[in-house]
Amino acid sequence: MLAFRMRKVIFAIALLLSLLSPAHSACDDPLADGVDYSKCRFSDGQDLQGSFLPNSNLSFTSFIQVNFDKSIMMNSNLSFGTFPESTFYRANLYESVMIGANFEKTNFTGANLTNADLMGSTLIEANFQNANLMGANLISANLINANFEGANLIGANWTDGEKCGPQSIGDCKK
């Protein structure tokens, strides 16, 4: 009788854990909220404008020259992904983790990157014009020739680990 009860408890716990874990998707499944597309390679040049991808795992993915304009990707993991020459115009990346990702020549114009973690990311020639990077982590990021014109950098952790001051619009004033 005890063994039967234990099996029921184990089954109930396994069922509960399967319901609480993020959805694991095949790389060709439609993009959606909370899914795991880690290590997928998507076609170059796709138009994913307006995608709804909050809480999703896009780590180690490849999205070259992809349009994510006006997409909702808050609380998502884009770490170690490849996104060169992509566009995130007015995208919501609030509190997303983007550690070590490649965003070379990527357009973040008007994007919400509040509290985003971009530590160690490649942001060479990235465009952050009028983007909100308040509280973002840019420690050890490569910002060569990046454009921050009009960007809100208040409270951001700059590449050297120092916090940007309250007048940091367009550049980090420590």
Placement of each model-derived feature along the sequence:
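Bacterial N-terminal signal peptides
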Residues: 10-19
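Tandem repeat scaffolds
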Residues: 23-174
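Bacterial N-terminal signal peptides that target proteins for export
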Residues: 2-10
